[in-house]
Design a protein with these regions (language model features):
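Short amphipathic alpha-helical segments
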Residues: 25-29, 41-42, 59
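Short helix-to-turn junction characteristic of helix-turn-helix DNA-binding domains
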Residues: 31-35
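A short, conserved structural fragment
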Residues: 66-76
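Short alpha-helical segments that sit at the start of domains
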Residues: 2-29
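Short, cationic-aromatic polyanion-contact patches
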Residues: 17-23, 76-99
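Short acidic, hydrophobic short linear motifs in intrinsically disordered regions
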Residues: 37-48
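Short amphipathic alpha-helical interaction segments
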Residues: 51-67
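Amphipathic alpha-helical dimerization/coiled-coil segments
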Residues: 90-117
Length: 117
């Protein structure tokens, strides 16, 4: 897979990532590396090293990312949600491609962390 992305798109992606706080950026990077896999709120909290409860993460950060159409959330049961990056977002699609091509080692680390639960 070859990324055929112009400089303007790469610049926009950098600007988008720079505009996010550390937690939101960590979430998007983790989800981009494990795409197309989805994770629960608890799994996501562990992946990014979030020390609070996944419920507080959901109320603030995750809901903001969902409102901005950066992530997609599917409700599997009343208390279990599947969270994944929105690969249809034009800039996040580029991020997913970058992570897929250049982030194989990091992807392996994330997937190993998910297996260790």
């Amino acid at each position: 897979m070859v990324i055929d992305t112009d400089d303007a798109t790469m610049y926009e992606l950098i600007q988008l990532m720079a505009s996010l706080n550390d937690t939101r950026r960590a979430i998007l990077l983790a989800l981009a590396h494990i795409y197309p896999r989805s994770v629960s709120g608890v799994q996501l909290s562990r992946l990014i090293g979030y020390s609070g409860k996944s419920r507080s993460l959901y109320r603030g950060v995750i809901s903001h990312l969902q409102e901005n159409e950066m992530i997609q959330i599917d409700q599997l049961t009343p208390k279990l949600y599947a969270i994944r990056i929105n690969n249809e977002h034009p800039l996040l699609n580029v991020l997913v491609d970058l992570c897929r091509i250049h982030g194989k080692h990091t992807r392996g680390m994330y997937l190993k962390a998910l297996e260790e639960e």
